[in-house]
Regions:
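A short, small-residue-rich loop immediately preceding and capping a beta-strand
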Residues: 19-33, 53, 170-176
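A glycine-rich, Thr/Ser-enriched phosphate-binding loop motif common to dinucleotide/cofactor-binding enzymes
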Residues: 1-8, 146-151
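C-terminal non-catalytic interaction/assembly regions of soluble proteins
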Residues: 148-149, 154-157, 163-171, 179-181, ...
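Active-site/ligand-binding loops adjacent to catalytic centers
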Residues: 3-5, 16-17, 42-50, 55-143, ...
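Phosphate/ATP-binding catalytic cores across multiple sugar-kinase/actin-like superfamilies
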Residues: 4-19, 158-162
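Short glycine/serine- and small hydrophobic-enriched flexible loop segments
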Residues: 38-41, 136, 154-161
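Active-site nucleophile and cofactor-binding loops and adjacent substrate-binding regions
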Residues: 24-29, 57, 124-126, 143-151, ...
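Short glycine/serine/threonine-rich phosphate/pyrophosphate-binding segments
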Residues: 27-37, 63-65, 149-157, 181-184
Length: 217
């Protein structure tokens, strides 16, 4: 069911004879991003097309960009089966950020393997930069984006600016998965200069890594 959005996006682009060069989605646990890229990734794996996939995660919970590829519990209670994934450790406690859906300690096993195999990229972005992009998007498009989606918008804007600087023309597809009308307090904090960016130290990460079980396979 998660790939429905990807199938719909592909069908809409096919209708107008378009193929995306870059496909961007926010990444917390992976369902959002995985659903969007699944149909396109299939084409890439079959050698039918060459897409560039970018996963965007919060800098305060950087499972892809700073996590370890290891077997770990999927839950903090260590009850569920373990899975091999990029993880910060089941005991990792992320800082409170407005994108609550992106605060999971691990990442989808499927996406983790794709990233590990070099089939997709990942980047981590700070909260204030995400809100800056969200406000720009709202003023231009008239849509106030959801907290998670703002991360994809940040990367999409950055890629568009890069195209403008290099003179390249690229089709960029990103996932906008909801609106942020229940998060107006966060926008108020951002505009009042009260937004805080959480920067993880290596020591913070090591505390989380200590909870990863030692599995020799």
């Amino acid at each position: 069911h998660q790939s429905v959005i990807g199938l719909e996006a592909k069908a809409a682009l096919d209708k107008y004879g378009l193929k995306p060069d870059i496909i961007i989605g926010c990444a917390g646990g992976g369902s959002n991003l995985g659903g969007l890229i699944a149909p396109f990734m299939g084409e890439k794996l079959r050698g039918e097309a060459d897409y560039r996939f970018i996963a965007v995660e919060p800098a305060s919970c950087p499972s892809f960009t700073r996590g370890k590829f290891a077997y770990d519990f999927c839950d903090t209670g260590m009850v569920c089966p373990m899975a091999k994934m990029y993880t910060l450790g089941n005991g990792f406690m992320p800082s409170p950020i407005h994108a609550g859906g992106l605060r999971y300690h691990g990442m989808s096993s499927t996406l983790s393997q794709l990233y590990h195999d070099g089939l997709m990229e990942a980047r981590a972005v700070p909260q204030s930069s995400v809100f800056e992009a969200a406000e720009e998007f709202a003023r231009v498009e008239g849509i106030l984006p959801a907290p998670d989606s703002r991360h994809a918008i940040r990367a999409a804007i950055d890629e568009a600016i890069r195209c403008r600087e290099t003179g390249e023309g690229k089709t960029i597809l990103f996932g906008l998965t909801g609106t942020g009308y229940f998060d107006l307090k966060a926008y108020e904090q951002y505009n009042n200069g009260q937004m805080v960016d959480s920067v993880l130290t290596d020591e913070d990460l090591e505390k989380g890594f200590a909870s990863i079980p030692n599995v020799n396979l």
